[in-house]
């Protein structure tokens, strides 16, 4: 029940506000979809994860995949392989 209440404003944004603007999210999944998935996985903490993601979504950030991690984290879940 609480998850549905937390997701409702995001769905409202997706349906009524987002279509009025050109796509601008630098990540996959989009920030709004990330927020929904984070809430589904982590409950109320998912809101914090979603807000942290929105703050990372700016013109100077590295675009790409940033899936919701299985464990709570406010950092980017970078799926690119890093070589050492």
UniProtKB/Swiss-Prot annotation:
Main location: membrane
Stretches for region Disordered: 60-84
Membrane topology: Peripheral membrane protein
Compartment annotation: Cell membrane
Keywords linked to the UniProt accession: Cell membrane, Membrane
GO CC terms of this entry: plasma membrane
InterPro entries, sorted: Membr_insert_effic_factor_YidD
Bias type Basic and acidic residues, positions: 68-84
Pfam families per record: YidD
Keyword Zinc-finger: no
Family that this chain belongs to: Belongs to the UPF0161 family.
Task performed by this protein: Could be involved in insertion of integral membrane proteins into the membrane.
PANTHER family named in the record: MEMBRANE PROTEIN INSERTION EFFICIENCY FACTOR-RELATED (PTHR33383:SF1)
Listed name of the protein: Putative membrane protein insertion efficiency factor
Species, as recorded: Streptococcus gordonii (strain Challis / ATCC 35105 / BCRC 15272 / CH1 / DL1 / V288)
